[in-house]
Amino acid sequence: GLAGSTCAKVLSGAGHPFVLCEASGRPGGRAVSDRTSDGFVLDRGFQVLLDSYPAARRHLDFTALGGGRFRAGAMFVGGGRPRCLENPLRRPPALFGALRAEVIPSGDLLRLLRLVTKSLGPGGAEETFSTGAMLRRYGFSETFFTRFARPFFGGVLLDPELRTSAEVFFGYLRRFVTGRALIPARGIGALAEQLVAGIPQGMVRYGMRAEKLVFAEGGVCGVRFANGVFLAGDEVILAVDEPAACRLLGSGRPRAALATAVHYFAADRPFYRGAWLCLPPRREESPVLHAALVSNAAPSLAPRGAHLWSVTVLPGHPRAADAELVRAEVASWFGENPRLMRPLAFIEVPYAVPEQLPGFRRRPSPWGV
């Protein structure tokens, strides 16, 4: 995955001998991209890189990744004519447009500015509250929840009920305010490919799924893999998800996982211009959280003359996999014929991120470290 690939890059740069073992046949873990036979690039879920992360700035070459960035703002759809609202912190005159649009009540816009200010300063964690409870404490209206909080931050957190710790919310808010969402030209899988590109040949091995840690004199002395190979080492770094860590260490129980799911559609023409994320009002009967013509941000994700839709849906919704329903809803936002959207794939990611409920940092580690 990205953590292991970054670790290997750092070790390689420092001149330390190591072997990076990857379970699959390529780097990236869940952050990989697949190219279809007709030239579309599909990520495992809607994935973007926020260029404000310090670690990303240290270890990645954004220019070499290519692609493009989404507009700082959102397109509000599903309630009449689509309306594009820009982030007023990046373009202050946009505040007047947001007030005129009346998509989000003016009082909520001012409350949101307060939260942004709080996120940029010290002590903005509020770790004892869920995101939803924190927003209600600040007095946000139900309209704000329906039109923005659930479709946008519910999608970011993979938690439309907003049960995730407010500490996590503030962390994401700070990154969105200070940076932009980037999609690499070759999809999100380009991140890990770039990280391992400079590692000497032979120091990365694929098809190596860790099966068991081998202990000696109270410490880990090596790893046995599913293919029968045993590798000894002075130090072993586990860069795996929680279920794998608990299994290998033989202790603890992983936190519940949050899932995600995405539909991809091809289109011969775009329904809108600009690199916008589309936010429909959150409705219980609909599985759709948000959508985007990702090829508007990174044209190389689709073959010449074609366009690529990414539509994020609630994985637990009874109609999440219904491509006909999903494309009909998306097309209705723009008054278009749903047949103009050709289904390409439906991708589910059962373990996207671990659940991060209020107080998650204070809970003892399941491994005692």
Regions found by a protein language model. Give the residues of each.
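Helical element adjacent to the flavin cofactor pocket in flavoenzyme catalytic cores
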Residues: F169-N227, L231
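FAD-binding beta-loop-beta segment adjacent to the flavin cofactor pocket
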Residues: P299-P303, I347-V369
